[in-house]
Amino acid sequence: MKLLSVNHLSKRYPGFALQQVSFSVYPGRIMGLIGKNGAGKSTTLKSILNMVHPDSGDVKMFGMDFYQHEKECKQQIGVVFGGVDFYPLKKLSSITAVTRRFYNAWDQEKYEHYLNLFDLDDEKKFKELSNGMKVKYLLSLALSHHAKLLILDEPTSGLDPVSRDELLHIFKRITADKARSILFSTHITSDLDRCADDITYIQNGNVLKSADKDAFLRSFDHLRTSEDKQPLTLEEIMLRTERSDFDETAL
C-alpha cells in the first residue's frame, strides 16, 4: 500500500502556480523532492499537509483521504521544516511536554532512546542547539510517536558536511525496517545521490519527472554529450535542465 499518494495537486499565487503535481511514496523508501529555489518544493509539502489550502487535487495517506481524515493521518506522520525555531528560550523538555499531548501513541521510552542516540540534552534551550542538533531534536519528536511517514523540508540545508553525512545515515536507518518512509525536499542533489530511492523533480511548479532513481537518471540520457563518459549525476541533470529552460526563456 502507498503511504502517500498525491494526485493533481494545484495551488495558484500571483506570479506562481503549482500545477497538477502527482507522485507516490511507498513503504521503506526515501523520496527526494528536488528543484531550484522557488520551484515549488515547499508549496508542494505545505499543500500536502493542508498548511496552505490547495485549489484542487487530492492527497491520500495510509489509504485515507488526508483532507477528510487530517487529524487521524497526522497521528501517523512526523513533520520537520527547516528554520523552525519553536520557542528559542524554552528548554527541550518543556517543548516536548507540550508536543507529547498531541499524540495518542507517544512513547516516552522511544523519545529517551533518540535523545541518547542523537546525544541531546533536553535541559538545553532550543536556541543553544546547532542547526544539526535542532534537526535531530525535531526528528526525535517525529519518531517518538511511531510515525510511519516523515515529511522534511530542506532538513540538511545550512549543515556542515559532517552533520549532513550523519543525518543521511540516520535517514537510511529509519527506512531500513521497510515500514517507514521519508519524503524530503532539497536543492542539495548530492544528498539524494547518496540516500534517495526515488526522485521527483519539480520545475516552475510542474513535475518534470517522478521515478525510482535509476529510471530517473536514465530518462535524462538525452542530455548527455559525446564528452560524457559516465551517466549524468543528479546535479548535472538539474544544471543542464535549468540552463536549457533559462536559455529558452531568455531567447
Feature locations, PLM:
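Helix N-cap at the start of a conserved alpha-helix in ABC-type nucleotide-binding domains
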Residues: 161-163
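Conserved structural motif at the start of ABC-family nucleotide-binding domains
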Residues: 4, 18-19, 74
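ABC-family P-loop ATPase nucleotide-binding domains
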Residues: 81-137
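Helix-to-loop junction immediately C-terminal to a conserved catalytic motif
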Residues: 49
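The feature captures the beta-strand-to-loop junction immediately N-terminal to the Walker
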Residues: 34-36
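Catalytic Walker B motif of ABC-type/P-loop ATPase nucleotide-binding domains
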Residues: 150-154
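Conserved ABC transporter NBD signature motif
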Residues: 57-68, 72-73
